[in-house]
Each structure stands twice: as structure tokens, then as C-alpha cells.
């Protein structure tokens, strides 16, 4: 539980994530939130919610774009990833508004980077043929998995969540009913689908 007496962003963020987990936040989403909150809290964690201003957030977004922030590449975070951080902050502050701890959501007054619109990049026929050819030497389970991914356009976790009872042999249909995800903390677990059922 968080003290109602002027909590810091970090303390309140931990409370909100815990609250959302109790109310059905997906495991992978919770892990991602906590990962982003490490970077966010390093900059704005000690600031009291009431004292948080748009310029604090704008400085955070600029810092996230600096070299060294991306542990894999050594560069800055992409605009898309910075916007994801912005959305986490906005979610936390929206809860604070809802609980009447602050009068407005400061994130709505900040300026995250603009996202460039891009088209989805689909495989060409020749690329699919090359993938299927390369699969011929792989174990059957990987052949089936990749063929299902290509044929259905389903997410990896949705294919991993398939069971025999999800196959309608008469109608030649697959029913996607659960999502299989892995996190280091929980191992492999089944969750609900990202966008509804079947």
C-alpha cells in the first residue's frame, strides 16, 4: 500500500503496477513495465507526484535517446521505445488522477518523440519458399510451428498455446484460445489472448 501523503513517483508506480497485476495485467506486460520503470525511476522516481512537471518528463525522454541507454546496441533508445516509457508514465499518472492525488495527468502535457508511420513488412513469396526449404532439415516440431506461423499470421505465443482440442478436423479450423509466454521469473505460463478469443 502507498501512503496518501504526497507519494514519490517511484513509490506510487510500484503501487499501481501491483494494483494492475491484481486486476489482470498480463505477466509479460508487468515484466515490461518493471523493466521500463528502472530507467524511469532513475530520473524521476524521487520526485513527488504533485511536483512532477512536463519538463521533468521531456528531460527524461531526451536522456533515454542518449547513447548508452540501449544495453544491446550501446545507442539510445528508439522513438518507439521512448513512447512506450511515456505510456507507462501516463498510465501511472492516470491512476493518480483517478485516486484524486493530482489534478491532471502531467504526461498529457509532456512532449514524447513523434513516431514515424511505417508499413508492415511482409515476406515475399520467394522468402517464404526459402524459409520452408531451410526448414526441411529441422525437427518436425519446428517445421510445424513455423508453417503455422506463416500460414495463420498468428503470434508466436498463440501458436505455442495450441492444444489438440483447438483443432477442428472437420471444418479445417484452428481455434486460438490461449497465449503461452515465458518470463525468467515465472517460466512458461498460459495467459489469455491479446485481442480477444478465437
Give the role of each language-model region:
Residues 59-72, 133, 177-184:
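Short regulatory "switch" loops immediately downstream of catalytic or recognition motifs
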Residues 12, 32, 36, 56, ...:
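Charged catalytic carboxylate motif
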Residues 36-39, 47-55, 59, 66-109, ...:
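N-terminal DNA-binding recognition helix of tyrosine site-specific recombinases/integrases
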Residues 1-59:
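N-terminal DNA-binding module of tyrosine recombinases/phage integrases
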Residues 1-4, 117-118, 193-198:
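Short, intrinsically disordered, charge-balanced linker/junction segments flanking boundaries
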Residues 75-79, 83-85, 98, 102-162, ...:
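Basic, Lys/Arg- and aromatic-enriched nucleic-acid-binding interface segment
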Residues 31, 90, 160-161:
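Short, surface-exposed helix/turn micro-motifs that flank interaction/cofactor sites
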Residues 175, 184-185, 191-198:
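C-terminal catalytic core of Y-nucleophile DNA break-rejoin enzymes
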Amino acid at each position: 500500500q502507498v501512503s496518501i501523503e504526497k507519494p514519490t513517483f517511484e513509490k506510487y508506480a510500484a503501487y499501481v503496477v501491483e494494483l494492475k497485476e491484481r486486476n489482470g495485467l498480463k505477466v509479460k506486460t508487468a515484466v515490461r513495465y518493471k523493466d521500463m520503470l528502472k530507467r524511469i525511476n532513475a530520473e524521476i522516481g524521487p520526485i513527488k507526484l504533485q511536483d512532477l512537471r512536463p519538463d521533468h518528463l521531456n528531460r527524461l525522454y531526451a536522456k533515454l535517446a542518449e547513447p548508452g541507454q540501449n544495453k544491446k546496441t550501446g545507442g539510445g533508445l528508439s522513438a518507439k521505445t521512448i513512447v512506450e516509457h511515456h505510456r507507462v508514465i501516463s498510465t501511472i499518472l492516470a491512476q493518480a488522477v483517478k485516486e484524486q492525488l493530482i489534478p491532471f495527468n502531467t504526461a498529457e502535457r509532456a512532449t514524447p518523440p513523434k513516431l514515424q508511420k511505417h508499413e508492415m513488412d511482409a515476406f515475399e513469396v520467394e522468402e517464404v519458399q526459402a524459409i520452408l526449404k531451410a526448414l526441411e532439415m529441422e525437427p518436425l516440431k519446428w517445421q510445424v510451428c513455423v508453417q503455422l506461423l506463416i500460414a495463420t499470421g498468428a503470434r508466436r505465443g498463440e501458436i505455442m498455446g495450441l492444444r489438440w482440442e483447438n483443432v477442428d478436423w472437420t471444418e479445417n479450423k484452428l481455434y486460438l484460445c490461449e497465449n503461452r509466454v515465458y518470463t525468467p521469473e515465472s517460466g512458461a505460463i498460459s495467459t489469455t489472448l491479446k485481442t480477444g478469443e478465437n
